[in-house]
Design a protein with these regions (language model features):
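Serine-esterase "nucleophile elbow" of acetyl-processing enzymes
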Residues: 1-32, 42-48
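Short, small-residue-enriched loops and turns at beta-alpha junctions
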Residues: 5-6, 35-36, 63
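Acidic/histidine-rich helix-loop elements
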Residues: 29-37, 150
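Alpha-helical cap/lid subdomain in secreted, periplasmic
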Residues: 39-174
Length: 174
């Protein structure tokens, strides 16, 4: 529901549609209601896309750290095998305001982000080219206005997410 833009006030305010307008490209969003769980079937579906401009891997909010560790590289490799030169962007989960008060939640997000970062570093070290990383820091701001429930993006949350990720998208598309 985060990826599908479930709490945007209208479809055009979901971040995928904003990115589509910003880049003048069609964006396919394969995040369905809590199901960004590194399922290999989704990686195969992504790999089957003809002539993609780039891929954004934003599964961290729904995955567990253990799942990222055990399946993240295989998920990536399925896509990379089909599209060896296409840019792939890895995105961290955002630290929403509730994590200031809920240390368990903060630790959970931190451990998932650390696994994502470790995966990215392993791939870079192994010689992977054309991969990019978007850290969580500064993603949504700290005023509490970016989410409806400390999880799902409001319109302003979608806009802030796009503002945070667009410099990396632009760099990847050069």
């Amino acid at each position: 529901s985060i990826l599908q833009g479930g709490c945007a006030s209208r479809p055009g305010m979901a971040f995928t549609n904003i990115i589509s307008r910003e880049t003048d490209r069609t964006v396919f969003n394969l995040g369905f209601s809590g199901n960004a769980l590194l399922d290999m079937e989704i990686a195969e579906l992504m790999a089957s896309v003809k002539d993609p401009g780039l891929f954004i891997l934003d599964y961290v909010p729904n995955s567990k750290a253990e799942r990222i560790q055990e399946a993240g590289e295989e998920f990536f490799q399925i896509i990379r095998k089909a599209h060896p030169d296409v840019p792939i962007i890895f995105v961290e989960d955002s630290y929403v305001p509730r994590t200031q008060f809920n240390t368990k939640n903060h630790e959970d997000i931190h451990s998932r982000n650390q696994e994502q970062k470790a995966l990215f570093k392993r791939l870079k070290k192994a010689g992977e080219k054309n991969i990019y990383y978007v850290p969580a820091e500064g993603m949504l701001g700290d005023d509490g206005e970016a989410t409806v429930d400390s999880r799902h993006f409001t319109d302003i949350g979608n806009v802030r997410y796009v503002e945070h990720i667009m410099p990396v998208i632009r760099k990847a598309l050069r």
